[in-house]
Amino acid sequence: MADTKSSNCNEHFSVEKLKEWPEPESVSLMKELAREDIDEAVHAILFRENYIVKKLDTYLQHEAVFKERRKEMLHKKWVENVAQPLQQRIIEKLFSYRRPGKSQVKYEYCLKHTNEPTKPSPLCECLFQKQQALREAKGPSYHRGRGKQPGIQKEAKETEKGLLFTRSPQFPLRSHCTVPRDRQRLHARFVQNKPCGRNKYKGAGSEKVSYALKPHLPKEEKKTVNRSQLGFERQFHASKLSQQNKGAEKKGLALGTRAQRPRSWAAADSPQGTPLVGRRVMTAEILGKHLASLQQASRAVYSNSP
């Protein structure tokens, strides 16, 4: 193989073959022609590419326009077929001249009765005038100083009170309307306990009777009196009185005479009855003395008994 190649090269580059080669001028001309052909081919290719790019750009622009136009056409069809008929129906429903419904009738009735002028009662007018006069006399500085402004709610409350007062039934002025129940009960008890013929208070004036009939204690006595202590006193009084009565009965039976009833210091058993206002709270010393005296009396009764 190497021998054949070397032989071919020698034949090609031999002297005879070199004479057959073209001249250098013809070679340069061929080069120029080849370059022109290449330039023309490249120019044609570029021109064709530019044409394709332009066509593609126009196509894309037309496609965007077509899409926008398509959206506009769809919106126009929706407005014509959906929006306008629906809006027309709503307008017809609102401005229809058909028979009104219940809500409309109620609204018209309410408007009719609220627009009617109403005349307030004379008592309400008097209260309102009095309130206006007081407000004018005090002036706005009074409310500003107190940090309060004359509000509408206060006026409404006062007018409502006046209306309630006018609507309330007017009861006749009788004893059960004017006199409280506690005073009536106290008066009934006083009448029942009063002895017949002779005055219980032995000529006492009307001032003492009215003073005894007062059903309440003054503030000073109310502060000192305790309910539990009063109940304890009453229970203690009842037990000691029962013991005294039993001892007196035993003593009377032993001696053959009826012993006098021991004088009680309770307000209910006393002949004159101490007034409710003059009642005092028993102290521990008084209770101890009373208990010691009762024990001595009971021992004397048991010692005298056979």
Curated annotation (Swiss-Prot):
Transmembrane segments: none
Species assigned in the record: Rattus norvegicus (Rat)
Recorded family membership: Belongs to the FAM228 family.
In-chain residues carrying the UniProt-annotated modification Phosphoserine: S270
Gene that encodes it: Fam228a
Region (Disordered): 237-277
Superkingdom field: Eukaryota
UniProt keyword Cell membrane, yes or no: no
Protein name stated in the entry: Protein FAM228A
Keywords noted in UniProt: Phosphoprotein
